[in-house]
């Protein structure tokens, strides 16, 4: 579980110590550290990190547990656009490996671009649900900025890329991760091989 208040996950004096308490496999630790772009932050106290850096460190700590079900509460909170794109790619990779991902978020643009299914909870119940395109296109209040701006002319547009494509423009090329993701290590002193990401 990645909680909304990620500071609750940190109990050690450095990011490295916090991560090392989860796994003793140095290769796995290096892999997840690189995946979450934490290499330059390992010697810092987790509370001295920015909000986005804390979010990445907390995500790394969760990934080291190799969950079959990944529960994320506001996972994009504090993240810059570049790492949001990397998070989207990472979640997609996890889904293709059979990991179930459930996330709660107010970041409707992220959900519209990344989710396989969306639901709106209201007063303890599911008020509406559906595939992202239908969910956001049919929702008058809880929808994306692109849908609000374009719905009178392009009712099915829910992302900026949808609007650009409908206007005859080309979608900007998707940015790759800053460098290729590290290769997962081979199983060492851990019970099962890490997910291939």
Residue ranges and their predicted role:
Residues 125-149:
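Conserved beta-strand-loop-alpha-helix hinge in the C-terminal portion
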Residues 111-113:
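A short, surface-exposed alpha-helical micro-motif characterized by mixed small hydrophobic
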Residues 26-41:
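Conserved ABC ATPase "signature" region
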Residues 45, 74-75:
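Walker B catalytic motif
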Residues 105-106:
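H-loop/switch region of ABC-family ATPase nucleotide-binding domains
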Residues 45-49, 53:
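Conserved ABC ATPase signature
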Residues 142-197:
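ABC ATPase nucleotide-binding domains
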